[in-house]
Amino acid sequence: MQQGDYNSYYHHQYSQFQNPTPNPNPNPNPSPPAPATVAGPTDLTRNTYASAPPFTGGYGSADYSNYSQNYTPYGQNSEHVPPSAPSFTSPSQPPPSPPATSLNPNSYSTFNQPPPPPTIHPQPLSSYGSFDSTAPYQQPTSQHMYYSPYDQHQTSGYSSAPPPSSAPAPNPNPAPYSSSLYSAPPYSSGGSSIPPSYEKPSVKFDQSGYDGYNRSRSDLGSDLYGKRSDSGEYPAFEDSYGDGVYAYQGGKVEPYGSRGTAPKSSNSTLFDDYGRSISFSSSGRDSSVSSNSAKIVRAVPKADVQEDSTGGVQKFRVKLLAETYGQTTTDVLCQIGLDGLRMLDPSTSRTLRIYPLENITRCEKLDSSILAFWSKTPVDIEAKRIRLQSNSYTTNTLLDTVTAAMFQAKEIGGSSRPPTSGKLIEQTAEKKKGLGDWMNIIKPVNEEKDHWVPDEAVSKCTSCGSDFGAFIRRHHCRNCGDVFCDKCTQGRIALTAEDNAPQVRVCDRCMAEVSQRLSNAKETTGRNVSLQSHEDLARKLQEEMERNRKSSSGLREGSGRRMKEVACPTCTVHLQVQVPVSGSETIECGVCQNPFLVSAH
């Protein structure tokens, strides 16, 4: 439909009622017929239709004869006449009732035809030219338009037009698509004598030209994309957009490739780039369960907190090796603190032995699994050796902890600034030299060690198994005390790192052990003579104990779960863990980082 074609829709709908030869001499002043009976509400319902309000079966020409007398007769002429200017004359015969064909259910008659554009094609005036009866009559020279009140129920016909002086000037540029132009009119009952007015301001022509009534776009509803409107009705010409055209809904569109993954609520599940679920659940229980299943709890070494100045201590499960004949190897808990090394009974925690830090002369590793330290009392002439056996990691940890504890105890008890390393080495060497000379003087020639195995207890060589006899003599290893033959005790080595230490007979096994021990002792001595190393070790011990004490207290205070002391099966370090409520839980050792299971029972 082209712009300016104002009659095509009319021809399409009412072509059977179109009169191609209109009356050339219409009667400007028809005689009023007998007054017709006003139709009741039932008649109005049956006879009215949406497109032609003024022509119903219950109304005669007298209903609007007064309206037409207010204007001069308007006849046919050759000028361009807008199709919306009615003649307000009654036809020579009653108009036939229009067909019962229902127009578009969403279409409304605008009942106000604004002035058409100046360039318009002429058309013959139909006998039904007064069909658009609600359009205002426009004087050729007038600049104002008058709008007659329209009663939607057609109770009293048309009222007289307002005087020109009271008509407001229309807005030359109204909003063409304003939804407020079609607000509901005041409703009145069918028997009211005062007709309610349905006044509308002027609007521009619909540039799209949907139909013969020049409806604006707002008649089609708020949905301009052919979708169903909120009221459930479909606008006209919904097939004019073609198939597959839908309204854009930006807020409801999901990202490409993620259909079904858009969040519907705060408890929904999202997915990352690798397809793993990302939960934003507000439930604290769910988050705690997921975190526990995804992460293994790390247990820290157990540290007993004491109220005195000794600070925190650490316990290690080790084996106390026998040093003399008659002793047995026992399992103990080695507790290292600033007060010394305590050997505790694992079952009763009773103190079996105590070695104060000030009495410990040195500490070194005999091999990867044995730690030895020497301790003496004021009544002892020579320091006694104590050997502790464990795995390699625990042995290294024990060595570092004992060394740091010794230097920290000296710094706390003595002066905070120890003597220089050169003087310390000289004084230590002099003392060791004098003590060694004195020990060599007073030591008997045939001295037997306490840990030596008696000769009568062994009849064969411990290493090669040769039977002892007149030609195969028994020899004791000065390090381990076992009995060997001469061929298995060819090694000679000093058992200590002292300068005047004598070379003694050792077995082949102890030869390698003592050599490794002496090399470790030299490295430890070179590391300990540095002042910075002393401070680092002391600081390390203090920080480690403080951290363990805080973590242990935090676990006790922050959690209502029962705590339990568990020994790591790998490094034998005692750990303080939370006992699970039921079943078992995987715990990671804070020392060796190896996982193990802790059961609820």
Swiss-Prot record:
SMART domains cross-referenced by the UniProt entry: FYVE
Biased composition (Polar residues): 63-79, 125-155
GO cellular component annotations of the record: ESCRT I complex; late endosome membrane; multivesicular body; nucleus
Primary residence: cytoplasm
InterPro entries: FREE1, Znf_FYVE, Znf_FYVE-rel, Znf_FYVE_PHD, Znf_RING/FYVE/PHD
Membrane topology recorded in Swiss-Prot or TrEMBL: Peripheral membrane protein
Quaternary structure and interacting proteins, as annotated: Part of the ESCRT-I complex. Interacts with VPS23A and VPS23B, but not with VPS28 or VPS37. Interacts with IRT1. Interacts with SH3P2. Interacts with SH3P3, but not with SH3P1. Interacts (via N-terminus) with PYL4 and PYR3. Interacts (via C-terminus) with SNRK2D/SNRK2.2, SNRK2I/SNRK2.3, ABF4 and ABI5. Interacts with SINAT1, SINAT2, SINAT3 and SINAT4. Interacts with SINAT5. Component of a phosphoinositide 3-kinase (PI3K) complex containing ATG6, SH3P2 and FREE1.
Phenotype caused by lack of the gene: Seedling lethality when homozygous. Degenerated root surface structures and vacuoles with altered morphology. Accumulation of ubiquitinated membrane-associated proteins. Hypersensitivity to abscisic acid (ABA) due to impaired targeting of ABA receptors (e.g. PYL4 and PYR1) for vacuolar degradation, thus leading to their accumulation and an enhanced response to ABA.
Effect of S530A: Abolishes phosphorylation; abolishes abscisic acid-induced nuclear import
Name of the protein this chain belongs to: Protein FREE1
Keyword vocabulary terms for this entry: Abscisic acid signaling pathway, Coiled coil, Cytoplasm, Endosome, Membrane, Metal-binding, Nucleus, Phosphoprotein, Protein transport, Transport, Ubl conjugation, Zinc, Zinc-finger
Organism: Arabidopsis thaliana (Mouse-ear cress)
PTM per Swiss-Prot/TrEMBL: Phosphorylated at Ser-530 and Ser-533 by SNRK2D/SNRK2.2 and SNRK2I/SNRK2.3 in response to abscisic acid (ABA). Phosphorylation is necessary for ABA-induced FREE1 nuclear import.
Residue positions, PTM Phosphoserine: S218, S530, S533
Ranges in a coiled coil: 527-552
Misc. comment: Reduction-of-function FREE1 alleles exhibit enhanced sensitivity to abscisic acid-mediated inhibition of seedling establishment. Seedlings overexpressing FREE1 exhibit increased sensitivity to salt stress.
